[in-house]
Regions:
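N-terminal beta1-alpha1-beta2 module of alpha/beta enzyme domains
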Residues: 1-74
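An alpha-helical appendage that flanks or caps ligand/catalytic pockets
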Residues: 2-4, 122, 128-159, 199-308
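Hydrophobic faces of well-ordered beta-strands that scaffold small-molecule active sites
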Residues: 8-12, 44-46, 76-78, 106-110, ...
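Active-site mouth loops of central-metabolism enzymes
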Residues: 12-27, 81-88, 163-173, 231, ...
Length: 333
């Protein structure tokens, strides 16, 4: 991998493609994880989404375990577990079990978004009154940290497995609140600029300026999320990128479904209005698409702008072989 870029990691949503199935998406995730491990990527993270026709990564801890089982060196983790959907003790037991089975390889990224709609939130038994969520989430993070740390004398409730594993916790988010909390707790921070980039620069500035050193993380450590489509030529990458553009256009219109097949750039232009295009491209402002040389220049500019310690890369490509090739070309860029 290029020495003038930060370490690269993978964010895989296990996207269900148009004409495909959830089973195919999960099998492709396992195959891509093996491929990216061989290419030298640092981490392989999967997300938590519920009741979405186009996303198969709902049982995050299960998927992390499956990926860890078919790989041997790459770090595997959640990007992330939506903590308000779960009891901290349960998450500690799940990831403590994973860390016990795969020591030194498990990451625990935490977010506070629902990852779904309100009806599904109710089905998940998540509290629908979010008025106090900004108070509850920090308490839950601290509680989870305590379960994974060494036990206190006479501690009445412990995570077994989990206690003493000290699974690295990351805070994920796209808000200034998340940046401030990560800084206050002395945790690494992953900004979700792959879909919500508006506050990226301000969040990183606040995170670094207010960071309180911790034993594990004496300095702030920032990861920036990107959409990257790499192909042999700029023209091919532009066509592959239309799948991502169509997906975000659907989100812009309030519709979510399988990842669409790519279209020509001219066909893409006919799909959206100027206002829709502006909105989608704003959401995709932290994206790179092109040949290896083009992508490298774009990532160098993002590194210079953000000072990112790591990039985590999503590749919403309809064809699995082309997706694997994109990560291959990126690793060599």
């Amino acid at each position: 991998m290029s020495t003038d870029l930060p370490p690269l990691s993978v964010l895989d949503l296990s996207l269900i493609v148009e004409g495909g199935s959830a089973g195919e998406a999960l099998r492709n995730t396992l195959d891509l994880a093996r491929h990216c491990e061989a290419l030298g990527y640092r981490r392989y993270w999967v997300a938590e989404h519920h009741n979405m026709d186009g996303v198969a990564s709902s049982a995050t801890a299960v998927l992390v375990g499956q990926i860890a089982a078919v790989t041997s060196t790459i770090r595997v983790g959640s990007g992330g577990v939506m903590l308000p959907n779960h009891a901290p003790l349960v998450v500690a037991e799940q990831f403590g079990t994973l860390a016990t089975l795969y020591p030194g390889r498990i990451d625990l990224g935490l977010g506070r978004a629902p990852g779904t709609d309100r009806l599904t939130m109710r089905a998940l038994r998540r509290h629908l009154d979010t008025a106090g969520e900004e108070d509850e989430f920090p308490r839950n993070v601290v509680e989870l940290q305590a379960y994974l740390d060494d036990a206190e004398p006479d501690q009445p409730v412990r995570a077994i497995p989990g206690v003493g594993t000290k699974v690295p916790i990351w805070l994920l988010g796209s808000s200034l609140f998340s940046a401030q909390l990560a800084a206050y707790l002395g945790l690494p921070f992953a900004f979700a600029s792959h879909f919500a980039p508006d506050l990226l620069d301000q969040a990183l500035e606040i995170y670094r300026a207010t960071y309180r050193p911790s034993e594990r993380w004496p300095k702030p450590h920032a990861m920036v999320g990107l959409n990257v489509i790499c192909a042999p030529t700029d023209d091919e990458a532009a066509m592959l990128f239309t799948s991502v553009q169509q997906r975000f256009l659907g989100m812009h219109r309030g519709r979510r479904g399988p990842l669409p097949r790519p279209v020509t750039p001219a066909e893409m232009e006919a799909m959206w209005s100027p206002a829709e295009k502006a909105g989608v491209m704003r959401m995709l402002s932290c994206a790179a698409a092109g040949s290896p040389a083009t992508v490298r220049r774009q990532l160098q500019a993002l590194r210079q702008r953000t000072g990112a310690d790591e990039f985590i890369v999503a590749a919403g490509i309809h064809d699995h072989a082309a997706r694997k090739r994109s990560y291959e070309l990126l690793a060599a860029a």
